[in-house]
């Protein structure tokens, strides 16, 4: 469980089974977050079915088919804190504020994404099926 300003969640195995907000996110908003280089910044490392985006990453797995590879809860944990599954990951924890280093004073205590935004991205990623 997370304390403080973040909503609590429970990790079960390799997943966070329950929605952070109690509701399913909006896939259209989630897609917008994924392609927004100022917000999610996902395409700095990942590529995917985003033909309008000319510069996509090649450091991390392609997002195409992610909805077939992982459950909703598995995707949620990877967004919240991928480091729990792979301590060597370069993927930032999008919904964690404790134990981080090299965080600007202006951003300390603030997650990269809100709980609602995490749920929106999860909703979008579940649509990316093989």
How should these model regions be labeled?
Residues 5, 77-78, 94-130:
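C-terminal capping alpha-helices of c-type cytochrome domains
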Residues 6-37:
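Electrostatic cytochrome c docking/interface patches
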Residues 17-20, 63-64, 107-111:
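Second-shell loop/turn segments in exported
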Residues 24, 33-35, 43, 47-81, ...:
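Gly/Gly-Pro-rich "capping" loops immediately C-terminal to redox-active cysteine motifs
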Residues 26, 71, 113-117:
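An acidic site on a long C-lobe helix of protein kinase domains
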Residues 40:
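Cys/His-enriched microdomains
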Residues 82-85, 128:
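Phosphate/oxyanion-binding loops and surfaces in catalytic or ligand/nucleic-acid-binding neighborhoods
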């Amino acid at each position: 469980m997370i304390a403080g300003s973040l909503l609590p969640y429970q990790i079960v195995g390799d997943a966070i089974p329950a929605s952070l907000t109690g509701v399913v996110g909006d896939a259209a908003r989630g897609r917008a977050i994924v392609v927004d280089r100022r917000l999610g910044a996902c395409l700095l490392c990942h590529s995917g079915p985003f033909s309008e985006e000319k510069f996509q990453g090649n450091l991390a797995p392609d997002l195409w088919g992610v909805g077939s590879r992982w459950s909703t809860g598995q995707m949620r944990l990877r967004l919240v804190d991928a480091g729990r599954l792979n301590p060597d990951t370069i993927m930032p924890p999008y919904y964690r504020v404790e134990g981080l280093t090299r965080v600007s004073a202006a951003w300390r205590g603030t997650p990269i994404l809100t709980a609602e935004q995490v749920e929106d991205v999860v909703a979008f990623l579940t649509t990316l099926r093989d």
